[in-house]
Every structure is written in C-alpha cells, then in structure tokens.
Amino acid sequence: MASTYSFDIVSDFDRQELVNAVDQARREIKQRYDLKDTQTEIELEEGSLIITTASEMALNSIRDLLLTKAAKRGLSLKIFDFQPPESAGGNRVRQVVRLKKGIDAALAKQIAKQIRDNFKKVQPSIQGDLVRVSGKDKDELQAVIQMLKQQDYPVALQFVNYR
C-alpha cells in the first residue's frame, strides 16, 4: 500500500476528437443550403484553426456549427479562443481560432493557492504546465477534485495520473 497518493491537474484536449469535429463540420458545410456556395475553408494547424469564408454571417454560422460538433465529440468549448475576424481580400472573411492547451503560471499559482487554503493535508506543486497534488488520504484528494470541478476556470481542467 502506497504511503502517499497523487494526481495531476492538466489542461489538454484529444487532438483526434478535434480532427473528427472539424471533419464533421466540413462535411456539413458542404451539405447545408445556406453554406454550400460560400467556399468555406477550415484549416487545422498545430495550435490553431483558420476559418475562411464569404461573409460575417456565414462565419457566425460556421462558428456555431464547429462548437456544436466539438461539444458532441466531448471536447470542452473552453479550448477555443476566437480572435477577431479580419478581411481576407476579395470580400472574404478570415478568423483565427487559437487552441488553448496547458495551464499558464498565473492560473497554476491560483489553483495551488486555492488548494492550500481549503485543504491543509494535501500539497500542490507546480510542474511546468501541470499542477501535481499529493497527500496521504485518497478521500482528501477526491475532495480537492470535487472542489476544483465546481470552480469556473478559463481553461478546461482534467485530472490524470491518479495513483
């Protein structure tokens, strides 16, 4: 029996599910009557999506469609950081959507402080873009997870490596 238990708090998403959601959105754009003739392109890059389409109205419809497909695939909508739309030339509109991954240092400090203030028997430690929480009691760690799930953070949190 282990003397201490721990888990990691990370902010990540399943890239394959994102690829599937984008693919489903592309297929529906080709089928939908209002979006069929807009020559819409959705490019998936390493840390972002680029949506290029004919008008601002079509861009709003595509954004809603993409968010719906992502939610159905089990992705958190907090991973999308929509930048302001910009003109792409030739009466076209482009929007860059950055994909949020990892916990930044300020948020990690806030999470660690919140854990320290509420739970005296567990020790949070910041390790790069994750927060490791360790303690002697499994029930305390479960309580930490429940407390963090009730909070609203600007990124989607996952709890991994529970041992």
Swiss-Prot record:
Domain of life, per UniProt, equals Bacteria
Say what the protein does: Nucleotide-binding protein.
User: What HAMAP family does the annotation carry?
Assistant: YajQ
CC terms in the record's Gene Ontology section: cytosol
PANTHER family reported for this sequence: UPF0234 PROTEIN YAJQ (PTHR30476:SF0)
Q: Which organism does this record belong to? A: Synechococcus sp. (strain JA-3-3Ab) (Cyanobacteria bacterium Yellowstone A-Prime)
Name the NCBIfam families for this protein: PRK05412.1
Is Iron-sulfur one of the keywords?
no
Leader peptide range in chain numbering: none
Protein name, entry field: Nucleotide-binding protein CYA_0935
Gene Ontology MF, one: nucleotide binding
Which family is it part of?
A: Belongs to the YajQ family.
UniProt KW keywords: Nucleotide-binding
